[in-house]
Amino acid sequence: MAHKKGTGSTRNGRDSNSKRLGVKAYGGETVTAGSILIRQRGTSVLPGVNVGQGKDDTLFALTDGVVAFESIRRSLRNRKRISVVASS
């Protein structure tokens, strides 16, 4: 006979680290080439002029300039597009 109560096991107790997704440079901000603009999963925001897209869908600036967001109309749903306007 056991004189101590056996402790049960649980299948909980795990959680992943946050991935720090989101907008890193907002509209009107000045950025340099290579700056990360948005970290995202999937293309919720589309790349525009002077913006590149990494293999993990991260959007980054290709040139120095000012960040500009615009709303574009697509079939079924509206989308956002981010561009970098060259500062003069």
Swiss-Prot record:
The keyword Phosphoprotein does not apply. GO terms for biological process: translation. This is Large ribosomal subunit protein bL27. Residues 1-24 are annotated as: Disordered. Gene3D superfamilies: 2.40.50.100. The keyword Flavoprotein does not apply. GO terms for molecular function: structural constituent of ribosome. GO terms for cellular component: cytosolic large ribosomal subunit. Keywords: Ribonucleoprotein, Ribosomal protein. Belongs to the bacterial ribosomal protein bL27 family. It comes from the Bacteria.
